[in-house]
Amino acid sequence: MTQHDPLHPLDVTFLLHAAELLPGDPQVDDYGPLYAAVARVNARALERDIYGSLYLRAAALLQTLVRLPCLEHSNDAFAWHCAEAYLVLNGCRLDYPPKEAVALVRDVASGAMGVGLVGRQLRAWSVS
């Protein structure tokens, strides 16, 4: 696997399954953000991936789901869980302090961190 070729591309089914695993099994209020997240992560222009690494793809996924809530509750937890699960599914395990992950999600929600910074942080937490 190279960082440019995910073994498992993102799809809406993956995101829906991730939502089912959250405490309280929150229902989807709006499917639009799920499809937007998938389209963004898989986006290509001029025959090149917009997000050239798994870490940038996971960062774009996290940002999209945090900034465009789609569940009846637990949207921040959902966004983090999806980003981490996407990395793990593609062979990239993370090791991070939970409080720092919470702070990262808050910074994404506030607009203080963009995709590039989030991608670098995810890469820094990678242990595989």
Residue ranges and their predicted role:
Residues 1-128:
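FIC/Doc superfamily catalytic core
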